[in-house]
Amino acid sequence: MSPSCSSCVNVLLIMCLMLLSLSADAYKNYTVGESTGWFDIQERPSANYQKWADSKSFSLGDFLIFNTDSNHSVVQTYDFKTYKDCDYDNNENNDTTEWSAANPSATSPVPVSISVPLVKEGSNYFFSGNYDGEQCKFGQHFMINVTHGQGLPDSSSPDDAAAPGPSESSQSGDDEVAPDTIVPANFDHPKDIESADDDKEVHSKKSSSSTTKTSLFCFVFMGLFASF
């Protein structure tokens, strides 16, 4: 192979590696607590959400999926004092969102799944504010650090995310009823929750197809140049 061809191969190889790296980027969904769900330690003694969170890496555009019931709430804040006090009622900085309001009066709690987008870098704090912070004080809390990663999707910004409350099923007394899924308004979810595994790296089918095509392109060109 001539020196010029060898240089071309090296350039193409570098370009292919860069393309593969870019196409491999994908937003992630993290199921909080995995099979434990989102409950205080009085209900789930094995729950250790901070330990779970410390084993993950979070970036902008990722989602946290809270599988819980209508008797537990999901509160997100950027204020450490609010988090430490397990109390969001007196928060005055407009930096706290109650994604799911609990319903303590319900005689038969219904399963609920809440999808929370990560739209701000830095420290993000989560807890259940139900029963005057009692659930939070009994282990239902954790903090994470969100990095920039590949940034937010083009169609989203921190102001796009609404904070809807849980919608109860019409069969509230049926323990086997499928959980409702609450997705923030005007925010493109990176994957279909129902068809994906816990903590599985995901992106759209278009991205997956693009990765495959890029890989094939690289292998074909490398094979062609290797034959010379």
Curated annotation (Swiss-Prot):
Compartment(s) of residence: Cell membrane
Alphabetical UniProt keywords: Cell membrane, Disulfide bond, Glycoprotein, GPI-anchor, Lipoprotein, Membrane, Signal
Protein name: Early nodulin-like protein 18
PANTHER family: BLUE COPPER PROTEIN, EARLY NODULIN-LIKE PROTEIN 18
Biased composition (Low complexity): 153-170
Domain Phytocyanin positions: 28-148
InterPro entries from the UniProt entry: Cupredoxin, Phytocyanin-like, Phytocyanin_dom
Residue span of region Disordered: 148-211
Source organism of this protein record: Arabidopsis thaliana (Mouse-ear cress)
Tissue distribution of the protein: Mostly expressed in seedlings, roots and flowers, and, to a lower extent, in leaves, stems and seeds.
Maturation-removed propeptide residues: 205-228
Key word Amino-acid biosynthesis present: no
